[in-house]
Amino acid sequence: TEGQTVHYSLPYGYWMLGFTASNSQYHQSVAGFNGPISYAGKSNNAEVKLSRLVYRDQSRKTTVVLKGFRRESRNVIEDTELPDQHRVVGGWEFSLNHREFIGDATLDGTLAYKRGTGGFGARPAAEEIAFGNGASPFLEGTSRLKLYTAEVSLNAPFKLGEEKLRYSGLVRAQWNRTPLTPQDRFAIGGRYTVRGFDGETSLMGE
């Protein structure tokens, strides 16, 4: 697995314009009946973000952010691309970000609305194509997503005897107004983030 990221920010007064582009590739061999099967994939992501600091004092600050995004992913088996797994999503996101300093602790909160528009070369999701571009009530995902998200995190240092420790907590929620593709659903994580989880199966939800 390998990846690269490029980021550039241009501040102007209370405004900030930023651009981020990244890509990653991975390759793995899976055991098959007639020998190892080569499975590979790659992804490309880009976003342009405009933010504005709307309030700030010595204990808190609030920022509004508008960004346009494009993300693409594809997978291949034995050098043959899987058409159903070639996904391109483009759209915009508006968010309200707040940071509160409470003593030595930092509390962050974000409310956001993400909208897939079909722009930036987006492709209909495989789920849309299978059900006539959204004509079926059993549609399981769309590239024109409508998604609300909320996130709160707390980072607080503390001492236990002579030991200096730090608490980090994160709560995340989302509310979908459209069926979501796997890339936008919640997942339990992987073998490196959940103890005792082998990664062979996954638990996902919208």
For the regions a language model picked out, list residue spans one by one.
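C-terminal outer-membrane beta-barrel translocator/porin domains of Gram-negative envelope proteins
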Residues: 76-206
